[in-house]
UniProtKB/Swiss-Prot annotation:
UniProt key word Cytoplasm: yes
Naturally occurring in which organism (per UniProt): Citrifermentans bemidjiense (strain ATCC BAA-1014 / DSM 16622 / JCM 12645 / Bem) (Geobacter bemidjiensis)
Pathway participation: Porphyrin-containing compound metabolism; protoporphyrin-IX biosynthesis; 5-aminolevulinate from L-glutamyl-tRNA(Glu): step 2/2
InterPro entries from the UniProt entry: 4pyrrol_synth_GluAld_NH2Trfase, Aminotrans_3, Aminotrans_3_PPA_site, PyrdxlP-dep_Trfase, PyrdxlP-dep_Trfase_major, PyrdxlP-dep_Trfase_small
EC number: 5.4.3.8
Annotated positions of the N6-(pyridoxal phosphate)lysine modification: K267
Protein name: Glutamate-1-semialdehyde 2,1-aminomutase
Keywords: Cytoplasm, Isomerase, Porphyrin biosynthesis, Pyridoxal phosphate
Enzymatic class: isomerase
PANTHER family, alphabetized: GLUTAMATE-1-SEMIALDEHYDE 2,1-AMINOMUTASE, GLUTAMATE-1-SEMIALDEHYDE 2,1-AMINOMUTASE 1, CHLOROPLASTIC-RELATED
MF terms (GO), sorted A to Z: glutamate-1-semialdehyde 2,1-aminomutase activity; pyridoxal phosphate binding; transaminase activity
Chain's gene name: hemL
Catalytic activity field: (S)-4-amino-5-oxopentanoate = 5-aminolevulinate
Cellular localisation: Cytoplasm
One GO location term (cellular component): cytoplasm
Amino acid sequence: MQNSRSTKLFQQALQSIPGGVNSPVRAFRSVGSDPLFIKKAAGPRIYDEDGNAFIDYVGSWGPMILGHCHPQVVSAIKAAVDNGASFGAPTELEITLAEMVIDAVPSIEMVRMVSSGTEATMSAIRLARGYTGRDNILKFSGCYHGHSDSLLVKAGSGAATFGVPDSPGVPADLAKHTLTATYNDLDSVRALVAANKGSIACIIVEPVAGNMGTVPPKEGFLEGLRSICSEEGIVLIFDEVMSGFRVAYGGVQELYGVTPDMTTLGKIIGGGLPVGAFGGKKEIMSLLSPAGGVYQAGTLSGNPLAMTAGIETLKLLKQPGFYQKLEEKSAFVAEGIAKAAKDAGFPIYSTRVGSMFCAFFSKDPVYDWDSAAKCDTKAFAAYFKAMLNEGIYLAPSQFETAFVGISHSTEDLEQTIAAAAKCFKAL
């Protein structure tokens, strides 16, 4: 594969952008190569600066559930920009998207729009602290909730990609308020809650973990968290930035039937533009400024372009049969890759929830961060490079989720499975 222009651009980027990228995982460091620079995308394909085409399973890290450049979304954005990109004032579009989100997500009675998933989780935690009058928060090893200081503790994903669980620059006095439990282990949660009784404001969790690969919740795990939080007066926050509108229209909480007190969203609800949101019970959300004393603000929050893209995306997701078709496509490709590995005698552990899936390079089950961390990352790196040479674009890290979109055709999926079979045999 010819990638000389991408290599040249990366060298140029290193002179002006720290690490040459604006988000660490894009650097391809964990797979030992230089990143591809993307020029354009359409449907299920992306095209790099050297003219190579790839079937895309990154989907801009999740938002592109419709595929790239969906004509209805693009047309709506073009029409919206003619009216102005941002006003710093309320618009009817904000109300429309808010009502669509409230209608879709079981836990959300009121919602505030922001500009990123990090803003959403950061603000949700501040609100939970304000609501409860407590300082401590509880999260899970390997779950990533953005790069705010309180949440960069055993954070999985980008940090895990480089083998660094924490970040310099996070004050110890702040980090001490972040308690860390083991994902899928209710006993670890109960022990921390008992040891810190009356001091925990919230438990925040990816209800389907997507930042240590795709790790589904064990039976009873989410229900157990709901019970503990209800008993102890702790706010339960589902971080559905990744899973919201992805595994079902109403997210994981619809799929599993467990309702948190608050939910954070992002990615899909912006239709590919920068957006985040957090919402929940009215009694909690009503404490948010200017209605209440918990402060949060943002210059571009609810900007008309992101709201327009989100509205058009959710309209398309609500079409009859959308998620059934997506489920069939996702099952086909995930099961096909798993079978290809088995036929080649190559040990992987395959997981999937809806259109999120992962092939863990492990012979043992993966159910938390410790089990995920045992994966053979060198073998994954070889697989990643081999798949890239076959025209398949996967996330450049073992600890990320692959995403299927509605634009992936049967031919695309079959080509992907055939490529995987070839690569597993070569490995």
